[in-house]
Regions:
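Extended alpha-helical surfaces
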Residues: 1-208
């Protein structure tokens, strides 16, 4: 049954409440399972980032290596920012952050525990210093910044036809175009102002 575990949890919760069991006792029963689920999700995310990075390192072309580096670094930054806002401890960050060449994840983890300003201060010393004002603006602005940076880095491949670079760049650019179309459609469906949609728009691979 598709919703079996969820329905079972809801049933357990309502049954215990109906029997007059105090909320704190209900939470003591249910929360460990929820924590385990969050831990499993974090482990899966970390494994996925490690796999992306390993594949990038093994690639022959710098476009693929640079894409893997940027993808993992951006994910680490987002994890650190979210963890800081939700008060996650250092050991959580040490498990969640995936190592990469452009970030010292141990320093990033410690900065996230220290506070938001510490994250910004650390990033100012890295290749992602220009991401700091974007992060201060909003999470969606940082997402846009990441996508635009990737597009700028792969754009020169248009003029390098005798390697795998143009094909890799084309596939990444097509993914970016699909994301942009979804942003436009979502804005239309949700009746967002044109300015709100435009500020989420990504740069295109070929600016015709």
């Amino acid at each position: 049954v598709e919703n079996g575990p969820q329905l079972h949890t809801q049933s357990t919760l309502s049954d215990r409440a109906a029997l007059g069991q105090p909320p704190e006792e209900i939470a003591a029963v249910l929360l460990p399972g929820m924590r385990d689920k969050l831990l499993q999700d974090g482990q899966i995310d970390r494994a996925a980032l490690d796999a992306i990075y390993a594949a990038g390192k093994a690639a022959d072309h710098p476009v693929i290596r640079d894409y893997a580096e940027m993808t993992v670094a951006a994910a680490d930054i987002k994890i650190a920012v979210r963890a800081q806002k939700t008060g996650k401890p250092l050991d959580f960050l040490q498990r969640a952050l995936a190592p990469c060449d452009s970030l010292d994840v141990e320093q990033l983890a410690k900065a996230a525990v220290e506070g938001q300003d510490a994250i910004y201060s650390y990033l100012q010393k890295t290749a992602y210093a220009d991401a700091v004002p974007v992060l201060q603006e909003s999470p969606s602005a940082f997402e846009r910044w990441c996508d635009n940076r990737i597009i700028r880095e792969i754009r020169p491949q248009q003029y390098n036809p005798f390697t795998v670079g143009p094909l890799a760049a084309f596939l990444l650019a097509r993914e970016n175009e699909v994301k942009t179309v979804r942003i436009i459609l979502s804005g239309k469906w949700n009746h967002l102002r044109e300015e709100a949609v435009r500020e989420r728009m990504r740069e295109m691979y070929r600016n015709v």
